[in-house]
Amino acid sequence: MQPVVETLSGLERRVDLAVSVAEVEKEVQAQLKRVGRTAKVAGFRPGKAPLAMLERSHGPGIRYDVINSLVGRAFEQAVDGAKLRVAGSPTLTPKTEGVAEDTLAFTATFEVYPEVTVPDLSALAVTRYDTPVTDAEVNQTLDVLRKQRAKFEIREGRASQDGDRVVLDFAGTIDGVPFEGGKAEDFPFVLGQGRMLPEFEEAALGLKAGESKVFPLKFPDDYQGKEVAGKTAEFTITVKEVAEGVLPEVDAEFAKSLGQAEGDVEKLKADIRTNIEREVKARLQGRTKGSVMDALVEAGKFDVPKALVDSDVEGRIAAAREELKQRGVPNADSVPMPAEVFSTESERRVRLGLLVSELVKQAQLQAKPEQVRARIEEFAQNYEQPAQVVSYYLADRQRRAEIEAIVLEDNVVAHVLENAKVADEKVPFDQLMGMA
Protein backbone atom coordinates (compact mmCIF):
# COMPACT_ATOMS: atom_id res chain seq x y z
CA MET A 1 0.00 0.00 0.00
CA GLN A 2 1.37 3.39 -1.05
CA PRO A 3 2.02 5.67 1.97
CA VAL A 4 -0.08 8.83 2.06
CA VAL A 5 1.91 12.07 1.91
CA GLU A 6 0.33 14.75 4.08
CA THR A 7 0.58 18.46 3.26
CA LEU A 8 1.45 20.53 6.31
CA SER A 9 2.04 24.21 5.48
CA GLY A 10 3.61 25.79 2.45
CA LEU A 11 6.16 23.38 0.99
CA GLU A 12 6.35 21.14 4.07
CA ARG A 13 5.15 17.55 3.77
CA ARG A 14 4.95 14.54 6.08
CA VAL A 15 4.76 10.81 5.44
CA ASP A 16 4.74 7.75 7.71
CA LEU A 17 7.23 5.02 6.83
CA ALA A 18 7.50 1.44 8.04
CA VAL A 19 10.05 -1.34 7.59
CA SER A 20 9.78 -4.94 8.69
CA VAL A 21 11.92 -6.02 11.65
CA ALA A 22 12.32 -9.36 9.90
CA GLU A 23 13.66 -7.63 6.78
CA VAL A 24 16.10 -5.64 8.90
CA GLU A 25 17.38 -8.74 10.69
CA LYS A 26 17.65 -10.70 7.44
CA GLU A 27 19.87 -8.02 5.92
CA VAL A 28 21.88 -7.66 9.16
CA GLN A 29 22.62 -11.39 9.22
CA ALA A 30 23.63 -11.35 5.57
CA GLN A 31 26.04 -8.48 6.15
CA LEU A 32 27.46 -10.09 9.29
CA LYS A 33 28.27 -13.20 7.27
CA ARG A 34 29.98 -11.11 4.62
CA VAL A 35 31.99 -9.27 7.28
CA GLY A 36 32.83 -12.57 8.97
CA ARG A 37 34.70 -13.84 5.92
CA THR A 38 37.49 -11.35 6.46
CA ALA A 39 37.03 -10.03 10.02
CA LYS A 40 40.01 -10.45 12.33
CA VAL A 41 38.89 -11.49 15.82
CA ALA A 42 41.40 -12.31 18.56
CA GLY A 43 41.68 -16.07 19.10
CA PHE A 44 40.12 -17.02 15.75
CA ARG A 45 41.42 -17.50 12.24
CA PRO A 46 40.02 -15.08 9.63
CA GLY A 47 36.50 -16.17 8.70
CA LYS A 48 36.13 -18.55 11.65
CA ALA A 49 34.77 -16.19 14.35
CA PRO A 50 31.31 -17.20 15.69
CA LEU A 51 28.37 -15.18 14.39
CA ALA A 52 27.36 -14.27 17.96
CA MET A 53 30.75 -12.66 18.55
CA LEU A 54 30.51 -10.73 15.29
CA GLU A 55 27.05 -9.58 16.37
CA ARG A 56 28.52 -8.05 19.53
CA SER A 57 31.41 -6.31 17.76
CA HIS A 58 29.85 -5.31 14.43
CA GLY A 59 26.11 -5.75 14.90
CA PRO A 60 25.11 -2.28 16.20
CA GLY A 61 26.89 -0.43 13.40
CA ILE A 62 25.58 -2.74 10.70
CA ARG A 63 22.04 -2.59 12.09
CA TYR A 64 22.14 1.22 12.11
CA ASP A 65 23.26 1.31 8.48
CA VAL A 66 20.67 -1.27 7.41
CA ILE A 67 17.79 0.60 9.06
CA ASN A 68 18.95 3.86 7.46
CA SER A 69 19.16 2.18 4.08
CA LEU A 70 15.73 0.52 4.28
CA VAL A 71 14.01 3.64 5.62
CA GLY A 72 15.71 5.71 2.93
CA ARG A 73 14.47 3.29 0.28
CA ALA A 74 10.95 3.44 1.70
CA PHE A 75 11.10 7.24 1.66
CA GLU A 76 12.26 7.33 -1.97
CA GLN A 77 9.44 4.97 -2.98
CA ALA A 78 6.90 7.15 -1.16
CA VAL A 79 7.98 10.43 -2.78
CA ASP A 80 8.45 8.82 -6.19
CA GLY A 81 4.95 7.39 -5.97
CA ALA A 82 3.60 10.83 -5.10
CA LYS A 83 5.71 12.38 -7.90
CA LEU A 84 7.37 14.86 -5.54
CA ARG A 85 10.76 16.61 -5.86
CA VAL A 86 12.32 16.70 -2.41
CA ALA A 87 14.29 19.79 -1.40
CA GLY A 88 17.03 18.98 1.10
CA SER A 89 17.01 15.96 3.40
CA PRO A 90 14.05 14.66 5.41
CA THR A 91 13.88 14.77 9.20
CA LEU A 92 13.11 11.29 10.56
CA THR A 93 11.32 10.77 13.88
CA PRO A 94 10.76 7.25 15.32
CA LYS A 95 7.15 6.25 16.03
CA THR A 96 6.27 4.02 18.98
CA GLU A 97 2.55 4.37 19.66
CA GLY A 98 0.25 2.07 17.72
CA VAL A 99 3.12 0.30 15.97
CA ALA A 100 3.17 -3.50 15.62
CA GLU A 101 6.04 -5.32 17.33
CA ASP A 102 7.34 -6.67 14.03
CA THR A 103 7.58 -3.18 12.51
CA LEU A 104 9.90 -0.19 12.77
CA ALA A 105 8.00 3.01 12.04
CA PHE A 106 9.18 6.55 11.35
CA THR A 107 7.66 9.86 10.41
CA ALA A 108 9.54 11.76 7.70
CA THR A 109 9.06 15.52 7.53
CA PHE A 110 10.46 17.22 4.46
CA GLU A 111 10.08 20.04 1.95
CA VAL A 112 9.35 19.89 -1.75
CA TYR A 113 10.36 22.16 -4.59
CA PRO A 114 7.75 24.79 -5.43
CA GLU A 115 5.85 25.06 -8.67
CA VAL A 116 7.86 27.84 -10.28
CA THR A 117 5.98 30.10 -12.66
CA VAL A 118 8.15 32.31 -14.82
CA PRO A 119 6.65 35.81 -14.78
CA ASP A 120 5.34 37.44 -17.95
CA LEU A 121 8.57 38.85 -19.36
CA SER A 122 6.74 41.46 -21.41
CA ALA A 123 5.52 43.03 -18.15
CA LEU A 124 9.01 43.34 -16.66
CA ALA A 125 10.66 46.77 -16.59
CA VAL A 126 14.45 46.55 -16.83
CA THR A 127 17.30 48.96 -17.49
CA ARG A 128 20.04 48.48 -20.06
CA TYR A 129 23.10 50.57 -19.25
CA ASP A 130 25.58 52.15 -21.63
CA THR A 131 28.77 54.19 -21.30
CA PRO A 132 30.49 55.53 -24.42
CA VAL A 133 34.30 55.43 -24.47
CA THR A 134 35.78 58.54 -26.10
CA ASP A 135 39.20 60.20 -26.33
CA ALA A 136 38.38 61.98 -23.07
CA GLU A 137 38.27 58.67 -21.18
CA VAL A 138 41.52 57.55 -22.81
CA ASN A 139 43.23 60.81 -21.83
CA GLN A 140 41.79 60.58 -18.32
CA THR A 141 43.25 57.10 -17.95
CA LEU A 142 46.57 58.36 -19.29
CA ASP A 143 46.55 61.03 -16.58
CA VAL A 144 45.94 58.38 -13.92
CA LEU A 145 48.87 56.34 -15.26
CA ARG A 146 51.07 59.45 -15.28
CA LYS A 147 50.18 60.23 -11.65
CA GLN A 148 51.01 56.66 -10.67
CA ARG A 149 54.49 57.20 -12.16
CA ALA A 150 55.05 60.70 -10.83
CA LYS A 151 58.51 61.58 -9.51
CA PHE A 152 58.47 63.71 -6.39
CA GLU A 153 60.82 66.67 -6.10
CA ILE A 154 61.30 68.47 -2.78
CA ARG A 155 60.15 72.09 -2.85
CA GLU A 156 61.52 74.37 -0.15
CA GLY A 157 58.96 76.85 1.20
CA ARG A 158 56.08 75.24 -0.72
CA ALA A 159 52.67 75.07 0.97
CA SER A 160 51.40 71.53 0.44
CA GLN A 161 48.73 70.94 -2.22
CA ASP A 162 46.68 68.02 -3.52
CA GLY A 163 49.01 65.61 -5.28
CA ASP A 164 52.04 66.58 -3.17
CA ARG A 165 53.85 64.05 -1.04
CA VAL A 166 54.30 65.19 2.53
CA VAL A 167 56.54 63.65 5.17
CA LEU A 168 55.47 64.42 8.73
CA ASP A 169 55.54 63.37 12.36
CA PHE A 170 52.23 62.88 14.13
CA ALA A 171 51.08 62.05 17.65
CA GLY A 172 47.52 61.54 18.82
CA THR A 173 45.86 61.24 22.21
CA ILE A 174 42.36 60.39 23.41
CA ASP A 175 41.43 62.16 26.64
CA GLY A 176 45.10 63.04 26.98
CA VAL A 177 46.24 59.41 26.74
CA PRO A 178 48.33 58.12 23.78
CA PHE A 179 46.89 55.11 21.94
CA GLU A 180 48.33 52.30 19.86
CA GLY A 181 48.98 53.34 16.26
CA GLY A 182 48.53 57.00 17.13
CA LYS A 183 52.16 58.06 16.71
CA ALA A 184 54.68 57.95 13.87
CA GLU A 185 57.77 59.77 12.64
CA ASP A 186 58.84 60.54 9.06
CA PHE A 187 55.48 59.27 7.83
CA PRO A 188 54.99 59.82 4.05
CA PHE A 189 51.73 59.99 2.11
CA VAL A 190 50.36 61.71 -0.98
CA LEU A 191 47.63 64.27 -0.41
CA GLY A 192 44.41 63.52 -2.25
CA GLN A 193 44.91 59.77 -2.61
CA GLY A 194 42.53 58.98 0.25
CA ARG A 195 45.06 56.94 2.20
CA MET A 196 44.43 58.95 5.37
CA LEU A 197 41.16 60.02 6.96
CA PRO A 198 39.74 63.18 5.31
CA GLU A 199 40.19 65.33 8.44
CA PHE A 200 43.85 64.30 8.67
CA GLU A 201 44.54 65.19 5.02
CA GLU A 202 42.70 68.48 5.36
CA ALA A 203 44.83 69.43 8.36
CA ALA A 204 48.04 68.77 6.40
CA LEU A 205 46.95 70.83 3.39
CA GLY A 206 48.62 74.22 3.08
CA LEU A 207 51.41 73.52 5.59
CA LYS A 208 55.07 74.12 4.79
CA ALA A 209 58.07 72.17 6.03
CA GLY A 210 58.67 73.05 9.68
CA GLU A 211 55.07 74.05 10.38
CA SER A 212 52.83 72.28 12.91
CA LYS A 213 49.13 72.04 13.60
CA VAL A 214 46.95 70.69 16.40
CA PHE A 215 43.46 69.49 15.45
CA PRO A 216 40.65 67.17 16.60
CA LEU A 217 39.78 64.05 14.60
CA LYS A 218 36.74 61.84 15.15
CA PHE A 219 37.28 58.23 14.11
CA PRO A 220 34.36 56.70 12.16
CA ASP A 221 32.10 54.33 14.09
CA ASP A 222 33.10 51.50 11.72
CA TYR A 223 36.84 52.27 11.87
CA GLN A 224 38.98 49.13 11.64
CA GLY A 225 40.73 49.95 14.91
CA LYS A 226 37.89 48.99 17.24
CA GLU A 227 39.58 50.48 20.32
CA VAL A 228 39.36 54.00 18.82
CA ALA A 229 36.25 53.64 16.62
CA GLY A 230 33.74 56.41 17.29
CA LYS A 231 36.12 58.31 19.58
CA THR A 232 37.61 61.79 19.13
CA ALA A 233 41.38 62.18 19.26
CA GLU A 234 43.60 65.24 19.35
CA PHE A 235 46.47 65.10 16.86
CA THR A 236 49.62 67.17 16.56
CA ILE A 237 51.38 67.06 13.20
CA THR A 238 54.70 68.58 12.14
CA VAL A 239 55.49 68.68 8.43
CA LYS A 240 59.14 67.87 7.65
CA GLU A 241 59.07 67.76 3.86
CA VAL A 242 56.85 68.81 0.95
CA ALA A 243 57.54 67.30 -2.48
CA GLU A 244 55.74 68.18 -5.68
CA GLY A 245 54.71 65.37 -8.01
CA VAL A 246 56.25 65.84 -11.46
CA LEU A 247 54.32 63.90 -14.10
CA PRO A 248 56.17 62.17 -16.94
CA GLU A 249 55.61 63.35 -20.50
CA VAL A 250 53.50 61.12 -22.74
CA ASP A 251 56.35 60.14 -25.06
CA ALA A 252 58.13 57.06 -26.36
CA GLU A 253 59.87 56.43 -23.04
CA PHE A 254 56.56 56.61 -21.19
CA ALA A 255 54.94 54.24 -23.71
CA LYS A 256 57.75 51.72 -23.27
CA SER A 257 57.39 51.89 -19.48
CA LEU A 258 53.80 50.73 -19.96
CA GLY A 259 54.76 47.74 -22.11
CA GLN A 260 54.47 49.28 -25.59
CA ALA A 261 57.71 47.79 -26.92
CA GLU A 262 57.98 50.13 -29.91
CA GLY A 263 57.40 53.24 -27.85
CA ASP A 264 54.53 54.20 -30.15
CA VAL A 265 52.27 56.63 -28.26
CA GLU A 266 49.33 56.18 -30.64
CA LYS A 267 49.50 52.40 -30.27
CA LEU A 268 49.65 52.89 -26.51
CA LYS A 269 46.48 54.97 -26.65
CA ALA A 270 44.82 52.29 -28.82
CA ASP A 271 45.78 49.62 -26.28
CA ILE A 272 44.42 51.76 -23.45
CA ARG A 273 41.16 52.27 -25.35
CA THR A 274 40.84 48.51 -25.91
CA ASN A 275 41.41 47.80 -22.22
CA ILE A 276 38.95 50.50 -21.16
CA GLU A 277 36.30 49.20 -23.56
CA ARG A 278 36.77 45.67 -22.22
CA GLU A 279 36.42 46.82 -18.61
CA VAL A 280 33.47 49.10 -19.42
CA LYS A 281 31.72 46.27 -21.24
CA ALA A 282 32.14 43.92 -18.27
CA ARG A 283 30.84 46.49 -15.79
CA LEU A 284 27.89 47.43 -17.99
CA GLN A 285 26.99 43.76 -18.40
CA GLY A 286 27.09 43.39 -14.63
CA ARG A 287 24.80 46.38 -14.09
CA THR A 288 22.34 45.31 -16.75
CA LYS A 289 22.33 41.75 -15.45
CA GLY A 290 21.62 43.09 -11.97
CA SER A 291 18.60 45.00 -13.28
CA VAL A 292 17.28 41.91 -15.06
CA MET A 293 17.76 39.63 -12.06
CA ASP A 294 16.18 42.17 -9.70
CA ALA A 295 13.12 42.36 -11.96
CA LEU A 296 12.83 38.56 -12.11
CA VAL A 297 13.10 38.17 -8.34
CA GLU A 298 10.60 40.95 -7.70
CA ALA A 299 8.06 39.29 -10.01
CA GLY A 300 8.75 35.73 -8.86
CA LYS A 301 6.21 35.20 -6.11
CA PHE A 302 6.44 31.70 -4.68
CA ASP A 303 7.59 29.96 -1.52
CA VAL A 304 11.20 28.81 -1.41
CA PRO A 305 12.34 25.70 0.48
CA LYS A 306 13.85 26.62 3.83
CA ALA A 307 16.22 23.67 3.48
CA LEU A 308 17.80 25.22 0.39
CA VAL A 309 18.04 28.63 2.03
CA ASP A 310 19.66 27.12 5.14
CA SER A 311 22.14 25.23 2.97
CA ASP A 312 23.08 28.42 1.13
CA VAL A 313 23.50 30.27 4.43
CA GLU A 314 25.81 27.53 5.72
CA GLY A 315 27.88 27.73 2.55
CA ARG A 316 28.21 31.51 2.77
CA ILE A 317 29.19 31.37 6.44
CA ALA A 318 31.84 28.75 5.64
CA ALA A 319 33.16 30.92 2.80
CA ALA A 320 33.24 33.99 5.06
CA ARG A 321 35.20 32.10 7.71
CA GLU A 322 37.64 30.83 5.09
CA GLU A 323 38.17 34.39 3.87
CA LEU A 324 38.92 35.51 7.43
CA LYS A 325 41.48 32.71 7.74
CA GLN A 326 43.11 33.74 4.47
CA ARG A 327 43.41 37.28 5.86
CA GLY A 328 45.08 35.95 8.99
CA VAL A 329 42.23 36.75 11.39
CA PRO A 330 42.79 34.76 14.62
CA ASN A 331 40.08 32.38 15.86
CA ALA A 332 38.13 32.77 12.62
CA ASP A 333 36.05 29.69 13.42
CA SER A 334 34.70 31.32 16.59
CA VAL A 335 33.84 34.74 15.12
CA PRO A 336 30.06 35.21 15.59
CA MET A 337 28.22 34.98 12.28
CA PRO A 338 24.45 34.99 12.89
CA ALA A 339 22.51 33.18 10.17
CA GLU A 340 20.05 36.07 9.88
CA VAL A 341 22.86 38.25 8.50
CA PHE A 342 22.96 36.02 5.42
CA SER A 343 19.40 34.70 5.21
CA THR A 344 17.83 37.52 3.16
CA GLU A 345 20.46 37.32 0.43
CA SER A 346 20.42 33.51 0.53
CA GLU A 347 16.64 33.45 0.04
CA ARG A 348 17.06 35.79 -2.93
CA ARG A 349 19.77 33.56 -4.43
CA VAL A 350 17.64 30.43 -4.05
CA ARG A 351 14.58 32.13 -5.55
CA LEU A 352 16.61 33.49 -8.45
CA GLY A 353 18.24 30.12 -9.06
CA LEU A 354 14.84 28.40 -9.29
CA LEU A 355 13.49 31.12 -11.60
CA VAL A 356 16.50 31.07 -13.92
CA SER A 357 16.47 27.27 -14.06
CA GLU A 358 12.80 27.24 -15.06
CA LEU A 359 13.31 30.05 -17.59
CA VAL A 360 16.21 28.16 -19.18
CA LYS A 361 14.01 25.08 -19.50
CA GLN A 362 10.98 26.90 -20.89
CA ALA A 363 12.93 29.01 -23.38
CA GLN A 364 15.23 26.09 -24.26
CA LEU A 365 18.30 28.23 -23.69
CA GLN A 366 21.77 26.74 -23.85
CA ALA A 367 25.42 27.75 -23.89
CA LYS A 368 26.57 27.07 -27.43
CA PRO A 369 30.16 25.82 -27.89
CA GLU A 370 31.09 28.82 -30.05
CA GLN A 371 29.77 31.18 -27.35
CA VAL A 372 31.80 29.40 -24.69
CA ARG A 373 34.96 29.56 -26.80
CA ALA A 374 34.43 33.26 -27.54
CA ARG A 375 33.90 34.03 -23.84
CA ILE A 376 37.06 32.14 -22.88
CA GLU A 377 39.07 33.99 -25.53
CA GLU A 378 37.67 37.32 -24.34
CA PHE A 379 38.53 36.47 -20.73
CA ALA A 380 42.03 35.37 -21.75
CA GLN A 381 42.84 38.84 -23.12
CA ASN A 382 43.32 39.98 -19.52
CA TYR A 383 46.47 37.84 -19.28
CA GLU A 384 49.95 38.07 -20.77
CA GLN A 385 49.70 34.60 -22.37
CA PRO A 386 46.09 34.42 -23.65
CA ALA A 387 46.65 31.26 -25.71
CA GLN A 388 47.73 29.37 -22.59
CA VAL A 389 44.65 30.57 -20.70
CA VAL A 390 42.38 29.38 -23.53
CA SER A 391 44.04 25.94 -23.48
CA TYR A 392 43.78 25.85 -19.68
CA TYR A 393 39.98 26.20 -19.81
CA LEU A 394 39.33 24.05 -22.86
CA ALA A 395 41.41 21.16 -21.51
CA ASP A 396 39.36 20.69 -18.34
CA ARG A 397 35.64 19.86 -18.28
CA GLN A 398 35.02 21.42 -14.88
CA ARG A 399 36.76 24.69 -15.76
CA ARG A 400 34.88 24.80 -19.05
CA ALA A 401 31.62 24.23 -17.17
CA GLU A 402 32.29 27.40 -15.13
CA ILE A 403 32.37 29.44 -18.35
CA GLU A 404 29.32 27.61 -19.71
CA ALA A 405 27.36 28.69 -16.63
CA ILE A 406 28.39 32.33 -17.20
CA VAL A 407 27.41 32.15 -20.88
CA LEU A 408 24.07 30.55 -20.03
CA GLU A 409 23.37 33.36 -17.56
CA ASP A 410 24.27 35.89 -20.27
CA ASN A 411 21.78 34.17 -22.58
CA VAL A 412 19.09 34.45 -19.90
CA VAL A 413 19.76 38.19 -19.65
CA ALA A 414 19.64 38.56 -23.45
CA HIS A 415 16.37 36.62 -23.61
CA VAL A 416 14.75 38.83 -20.97
CA LEU A 417 15.98 41.99 -22.72
CA GLU A 418 14.42 40.79 -25.98
CA ASN A 419 11.02 40.43 -24.33
CA ALA A 420 10.86 42.96 -21.47
CA LYS A 421 10.19 46.69 -21.34
CA VAL A 422 13.71 48.07 -21.66
CA ALA A 423 14.80 51.58 -20.68
CA ASP A 424 18.27 52.62 -21.87
CA GLU A 425 20.34 54.67 -19.45
CA LYS A 426 23.73 56.34 -19.87
CA VAL A 427 26.15 55.96 -16.98
CA PRO A 428 28.94 58.54 -16.59
CA PHE A 429 32.36 56.95 -17.01
CA ASP A 430 33.63 58.12 -13.61
CA GLN A 431 30.57 56.71 -11.87
CA LEU A 432 30.84 53.37 -13.67
CA MET A 433 34.51 53.01 -12.78
CA GLY A 434 33.98 54.09 -9.16
CA MET A 435 35.99 57.28 -9.63
CA ALA A 436 33.18 59.76 -8.95
From Swiss-Prot:
It catalyses: [protein]-peptidylproline (omega=180) = [protein]-peptidylproline (omega=0). This is Trigger factor. One of its GO terms (biological process) is protein unfolding. GO terms for molecular function: peptidyl-prolyl cis-trans isomerase activity; protein folding chaperone; ribosome binding. It comes from Bordetella pertussis (strain Tohama I / ATCC BAA-589 / NCTC 13251). Residues 163-248 form the PPIase FKBP-type domain. Its EC number is 5.2.1.8. GO terms for cellular component: cytoplasm. Involved in protein export. Acts as a chaperone by maintaining the newly synthesized protein in an open conformation. Functions as a peptidyl-prolyl cis-trans isomerase. It is found in: Cytoplasm. Keywords: Cell cycle, Cell division, Chaperone, Cytoplasm, Isomerase, Rotamase. It is an enzyme of class 5 (isomerase). Its main location: cytoplasm. Disulfide bonds: none annotated. The gene is tig. SUPFAM superfamilies: FKBP-like, Triger factor/SurA peptide-binding domain-like, Trigger factor ribosome-binding domain. It comes from the Bacteria. NCBIfam families: tig (TIGR00115). Belongs to the FKBP-type PPIase family. Tig subfamily. Consists of 3 domains; the N-terminus binds the ribosome, the middle domain has PPIase activity, while the C-terminus has intrinsic chaperone activity on its own. It holds the Pfam family FKBP_C.
